[in-house]
């Protein structure tokens, strides 16, 4: 298959303060060491590596109610949003590498600043749409979408550090794929707002092509618009992605993951990609666990930019 040339901007976001344990900030380093930049170029893509962002700790970052590290996370997501906006203004597909999933506040808000009509495919075991009042633990990695949803604006307190965020999504702008660990407060939000999701129950009963057929028909069937893929590695089964912060059994297989990413690529509408939450051995994962997870994450990411299981060559 001949692959069209892409213009890609890669941003590293080595950040872990959206949750309490370190290790996830190693994700950008691991994907680069695995050859992400070189392999993207091998497919004929024009790639600009924007390097890793620097995220300063905010002093005296006391909890806001039960929300932990609010100012540090808020500042990090603002820095990332500005970087994503710059990549999109340069007319490049933005590939962001995390990092924990609190970063999605920045990647999606930064993308929407240039393409306000975007839609989101959220691949994850978790819904990540708790509000500060529904979150059982106060960790912001489980709350990014609540800051972005227009329908939740009235429910959101003024969390310090997030003053810059303007909600940019409506319920019709997002589809979840692979949910299987959803908090009660999140389930209530999904049902109340009518957000479309294909949990692992639906995924198990639908054929692989039907999952993406439903997703794409819902989001871009009538009106073509930019797609933002926010991909948490724990959306896949731990057997193929064991080194992640919140593994959850019963996830998507390697084959199912590749199909999803390949089909998103084929739309020609993929405009932003997050690859989120690969852990390091500092968390107790074995070297083999990390290697398997990074290889899986690399293959999924490259599938968004032209890598196909049938083989490929760059167009001339």
UniProtKB/Swiss-Prot annotation:
GO terms for cellular component: cytoplasm; cytosol; nucleus. Mn(2+) 2 binds at residues 124, 126, 232, 234. Binds 2 manganese ions per subunit. Its EC number is 3.5.3.1. Substrate binds at residues 126-130, 137-139, 183, 246. Keywords: Arginine metabolism, Hydrolase, Manganese, Metal-binding, Urea cycle. Homotrimer. Belongs to the arginase family. This is Arginase-1. The lineage of its organism: Eukaryota, Metazoa, Chordata, Craniata, Vertebrata.
């Amino acid at each position: 298959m001949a692959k069209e040339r892409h213009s890609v901007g890669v941003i590293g976001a080595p950040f872990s303060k959206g949750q309490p344990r370190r290790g996830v900030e190693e994700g950008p380093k691991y994907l680069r060491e695995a050859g992400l930049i070189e392999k993207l170029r091998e497919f004929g893509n024009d790639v600009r590596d924007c390097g890793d962002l620097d995220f300063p700790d905010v002093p005296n970052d006391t909890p806001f109610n039960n929300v932990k590290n609010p100012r540090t996370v808020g500042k990090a997501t603002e820095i990332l949003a500005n970087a994503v906006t710059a990549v999109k203004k340069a007319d490049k597909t933005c590939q962001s590498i995390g990092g924990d999933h609190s970063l999605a506040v920045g990647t999606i808000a930064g993308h929407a600043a240039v393409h306000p009509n975007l839609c989101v495919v959220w691949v994850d075991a978790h819904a990540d749409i708790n509000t500060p009042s529904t979150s059982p633990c106060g960790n912001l990695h489980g709350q990014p979408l609540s800051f972005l949803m227009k329908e939740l604006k009235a429910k959101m307190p003024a969390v310090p550090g997030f003053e810059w965020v303007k909600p940019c999504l409506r319920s019709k702008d997002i589809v979840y794929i692979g949910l299987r660990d959803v908090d009660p407060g999140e389930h209530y939000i999904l049902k109340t707002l009518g957000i479309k999701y294909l949990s692992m129950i639906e995924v198990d009963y639908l054929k692989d092509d039907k999952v993406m057929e439903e997703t794409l028909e819902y989001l871009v069937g009538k009106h073509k618009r930019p797609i933002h893929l926010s991909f948490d590695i724990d959306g896949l089964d731990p057997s193929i992605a064991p080194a992640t912060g919140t593994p959850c059994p019963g996830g998507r297989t390697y084959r199912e993951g590749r199909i999803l990413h390949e089909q998103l690529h084929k739309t020609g509408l993929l405009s932003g990609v997050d690859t989120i939450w690969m852990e390091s051995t500092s968390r107790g994962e074995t070297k083999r666990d990390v290697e398997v997870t990074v290889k899986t994450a690399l293959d999924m990411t490259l599938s968004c930019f032209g890598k196909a299981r049938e083989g490929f060559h760059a167009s001339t």
